[in-house]
């Protein structure tokens, strides 16, 4: 594997210099393959180290991996290369997710600059989240097309994301701010929706859960550190510097993936191999299975696959619908806290903007503690069970992880709401956020694993629908959060009754994983989509 050669930078250098990355050994292998196919007209046989490509009924020579140890297969890359790609995805996810919360410390200044109320400015947060809810329905499926791959989607969409921060920082009206924020969320979405697929490209199933956890920490770290970084910019300069800083962070991520992010999509790598074979031999029959399958898709079929099916699954499947609502609530609480924390810690404890940003670190600490415990659970329980079953296990088994987590969310909300008063030390409500982080982390890990195992054939559609559902819910919460807390009070505990309302809703959700654990198999057996 030529690591740098397979990056966007390497491909550009190759294109400009007109150098072919084919070598004499590969050419020799291709010609030997062709001679064997022509002489034997056989398929799936081997001679020495050379695999004869299968010839289908239409005369296409199907290009696959040479064998299980093919070095171009991302699963066979060296450890250092996999770790570099994992870092790329985690940092890219952080760089986009930080864009949601980095916005919040400057809301008051933006109100003064634009002469508008709170809700119109908060729409900048709402539309950003809504943008990365809709984006995956359009951009993520493009990464599954063999001719496109994942790498170029990451680079091009992030380039647009970086450029959009310039008019956002320079604008002085909602007419500029709101469309730019929506577009930024839209073009930042591939990292959030496709990052997990990239990790699945390079890590074996028994190692993937560990590295998915690191990716989750990157996703949590963005919103958690955003208020601190944005607050520092507001204090040091102005609200405009929130977006200049976001441009710098995402610009650095763009440089990293431009130089150090190779293509990981199996379909695209094999497509490029088939393309090289066609170029070397002049034989246009060299094709990949994915290439042939995608060539038969019409625009209507593609729309059904990417837009309609995720919505149908989200509404018609009881398992998917119930988990989407639950995950949506948990996800929305995080964005609601972007309004609740300033109300509590600024009005009651008189924190500065910087100090208020530090409050969110409690969530990150809770996530890191849970991560360490979850790793032990994976190593001692989950992975051995997976290996012992040969990968054939009931999906409901993973829901056990969520059982304690279902109680953590309401505990956190009641604790946070009623401890947030001047007579109670400020550290007490912050400690409650550790329970939220732990509950959210475990719930997301178990429920996403359950959805993936229950709908293996339609996992992309299920995850796209979940992303749309939870992000749409989260986008709406900041719009009514301040009014809810201000109107419910009481004045000595301003977030108490608002948190209590959410805590009661969270209590109503507690039975969901238990019900699915007991009756999930029956529900799946009645579904035409589930395994």
From Swiss-Prot:
It is a multi-pass membrane protein. SUPFAM superfamilies: MFS general substrate transporter. PROSITE patterns: MFS. One of its GO terms (biological process) is xenobiotic detoxification by transmembrane export across the plasma membrane. GO terms for cellular component: Golgi apparatus; plasma membrane. One of its GO terms (molecular function) is spermine transmembrane transporter activity. The chain crosses the membrane at residues 83-103, 119-139, 158-178, 182-202, 214-234, 241-261, 325-345, 358-378, 398-418, 424-444, 495-515. Its main location: membrane. It is found in: Membrane. Belongs to the major facilitator superfamily. CAR1 family. PANTHER family: FLUCONAZOLE RESISTANCE PROTEIN 1, MAJOR FACILITATOR SUPERFAMILY. This is Caffeine resistance protein 5. It comes from Schizosaccharomyces pombe (strain 972 / ATCC 24843). The gene is caf5.
